[in-house]
Amino acid sequence: PLRLVGSEMCIRDRLKWVVMLAPLGLVFFLSARIHALKASTAQAVFWIYAALMGVSFAVILIQFTGASVARVFFITAGTFAAMSIWGYTTKKDLTGMGSFLFMGLIGIIIASVVNIFVGSSALQFGISVIGVLVFVGLTAYDTQNIKNEYAGHLDDETQGKLAISGALRLYLDFINLFIMLLQLFGDRR
């Protein structure tokens, strides 16, 4: 019986890593190959990615109370909508923000990897605060970029690929903003 329990735990641990890392692999695949894929194939990969994110998100959400998840979701939705509208309507060119926001994103990734080993709540707080700022900025930046990409008169296939690419970017902005806000304002169980 102990052997079986150990095997089940090992399988669960492996499954947890697959569920957590598979969406990341699909994001890299879709980002790198979107121009080589047909729009319909890219869309199918995007839907598979979204489904896997739903499964992996369950692992995160069970750590928080339902009320705090709902509260943070509405805060995220309002913030995302406001920044997306601003990015779409502003006359200011946000292109210059791109490299700064990308550097911030790289910093968040590096700090998050370090914090896996360090386990510092202060570092996690800093990552979350900076993450909110970066993903708020990326929401406006990506929205304006998508608008500008669509301004060119492109064929239907290219527009389909741009739609998937844009949806992926905004989806990632929303999900990551939600996670950062949940780290800051979510009530743990």
Model segments located where?
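Active-site cofactor/substrate anionic-group-binding motifs, chiefly glycine-
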Residues: R12-G54
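Cytoplasmic-side transmembrane-helix entry/capping segments in multi-pass membrane proteins
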Residues: A39-A51, A70-T76, T95-L105, S128-V129
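C-terminal ends of transmembrane helices
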Residues: L26-A39, V59, A82-L94
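Juxtamembrane boundary at the C-terminal end of a transmembrane helix
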Residues: F178-R189
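Structural signature of hydrophobic alpha-helical transmembrane segments
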Residues: R12-P23, F46-W47, T65-T79, S128-L133
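Small-residue-rich segments of transmembrane alpha-helices in multi-pass membrane proteins
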Residues: F46-V59, F102-V113, K161
